[in-house]
A protein has these predicted regions:
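Glycine-rich, mobile lid/loop segments that gate access to catalytic sites or pores
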Residues: 1-135
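Conserved phosphate/anionic-ligand binding catalytic regions in large, soluble enzymes, centered on
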Residues: 1-9, 134-159, 163
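Conserved structured core elements
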Residues: 17, 93, 97, 145-148, ...
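Glycine-rich loops and low-complexity Gly/Arg-rich segments
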Residues: 25-27, 73-75, 149-153, 175-178
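Structural beta-strand/beta-sheet cores of well-ordered domains, especially the beta-sheet scaffolds
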Residues: 44-46, 62-64, 121-125, 129-131, ...
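Short, functional N-terminal and low-complexity linear motifs
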Residues: 52-55, 148-153, 197-198
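Conserved helix-loop functional segments at active or binding sites
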Residues: 105, 109, 113, 156-160, ...
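Hydrophobic alpha-helical bundle architecture
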Residues: 152, 159-198
């Protein structure tokens, strides 16, 4: 079992995971508000890649990947493969521009100044890179328990013992020992003993 903490963020989580969560929280808020990006559906995922310097200090947000479920809001007038491809490309283009011009600025606005400075014009943005994403949630993925164990912890930074947390009571060390190790790591970083603990 592993516990991890870092002083990169106020909640002692890795910056890449924290930004990824914030992107999805804000995307869900936009969907619930229902004023912009009205085609959004509930399923989504994100990944953020951070560039670090030699001293392991974040220097910039390198890449953001956002995949978001959406309505099929552009329907081709003809029932041909070519017409469907054109409609799909238009949808994906609109979604890309909305993520770039609506979602990303809203997320940046909520960040502390030191993190806002990590966003630059070299940011690589991938939106729905595998194409349209109309079918999602349990309809698109069956068997949701224990499938995303890395995102349940530290997003690839730090370690993971391999066991899922879902569906386990506190007597199972996969869950309880990982929580205890995180508690220890977080308190060591919060006390200033170290910048990062695993």
């Amino acid at each position: 079992m592993f516990g991890y903490a870092s002083n990169e963020t106020d909640n002692y989580m890795p910056l890449s995971l924290d930004l990824s969560h914030l992107l999805l929280i804000e995307l869900a808020a936009i969907r619930r508000e229902g004023k912009e990006m009205t085609y959004l559906r509930p399923d989504s995922k994100s990944q953020v890649t951070i560039e670090y310097n030699e001293d392991n200090v974040p220097v910039r947000v390198h890449t953001i990947v956002i995949s978001t479920q959406h309505d099929e809001f552009i329907v081709p007038t003809e029932q041909t493969h070519e017409a469907q491809m054109v409609a799909d490309e238009k949808m994906l283009s609109i979604i890309f521009e909305d993520v770039k011009n609506i979602l990303i600025p809203r997320v940046i606005a909520k960040l502390p100044e030191r993190l806002k400075a990590l966003f630059d014009d070299k940011l690589i943005l991938h939106v729905n890179p595998t194409g349209k994403f109309v079918i999602g949630g349990p309809h698109g993925d069956t068997g949701l328990t224990g499938r995303k164990i890395i995102v349940d912890t530290y997003g690839g930074k730090g370690g993971h013992g391999g066991g899922a947390f879902s569906g386990k009571d506190p007597s199972k060390v996969d869950r309880s020992a990982a929580y205890a190790a995180r508690h220890i790591a977080k308190n060591l970083v919060a006390a200033g003993v170290s910048d990062e603990v695993l």
